[in-house]
């Protein structure tokens, strides 16, 4: 993996983590249950004015800073996680499944927040299994199979349908969506600890020879 053309090794990752690169975890349980929200968002830098600015942007009242995580609603907790990530004006935000357990309205609100972050010039890498939600905010989508990218396509290609996509797994993914009646793909993904050589999809591929 490279970041700004430099290999993102362990030493480089320590340098940019939390500064250039921020991470938003899947679970709101990431928040420390014994620490007030404001202190967690401010972190070691202690920039309370920046914290107030970020809270205002994400419609979090000043009094939220004095609350503990258990006092927050699901939507508020998600916004607190986003606020934590943008505190230091990171260049890249990685969000791991940021919408589980949220109703559609809150999920779309969360994704729209990411869209605004991206439009401001920050890179956003959104990890999700929900294609329909991703299609509403992404520019490009990378399709993973057994931990490997098999295709990177423009959102328009997914909207056009399977004929605009190239890899058989991407096409199968579209077939499996609710609007396509959940058409099942026979077979199983290879075990991560025993990956075969060559194409990981070959045993399930409709184009194999």
Where does each model-flagged region fall?
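Short catalytic/signature loops enriched in Gly
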Residues: 154-209
């Amino acid at each position: 993996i490279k970041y700004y053309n430099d290999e993102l090794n362990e030493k480089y990752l320590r340098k940019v983590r939390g500064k250039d690169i921020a991470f938003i975890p899947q679970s709101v349980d990431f928040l420390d249950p014994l620490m007030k929200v404001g202190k967690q968002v401010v972190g070691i830098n202690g920039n309370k004015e920046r914290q107030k600015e970020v809270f205002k942007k994400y419609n979090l009242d000043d009094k939220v800073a004095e609350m503990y995580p258990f006092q927050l609603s699901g939507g508020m907790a998600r916004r607190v996680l986003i606020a934590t990530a943008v505190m230091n004006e990171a260049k890249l935000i990685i969000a791991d499944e940021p919408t589980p357990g949220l109703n559609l309205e809150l999920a779309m609100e969360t994704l729209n927040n990411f869209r605004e972050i991206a439009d401001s010039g920050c890179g956003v890498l959104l990890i999700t299994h929900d294609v329909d939600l991703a299609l509403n905010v992404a520019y490009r989508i990378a399709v993973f199979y057994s931990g490997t990218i098999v295709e990177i396509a423009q959102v328009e290609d997914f909207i056009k349908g399977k004929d605009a996509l190239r890899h058989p797994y991407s096409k199968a993914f579209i077939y499996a969506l609710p609007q396509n009646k959940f058409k099942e793909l026979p077979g199983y993904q290879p075990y991560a600890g025993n990956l075969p050589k060559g194409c990981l999809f070959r045993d399930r591929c409709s184009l194999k020879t």
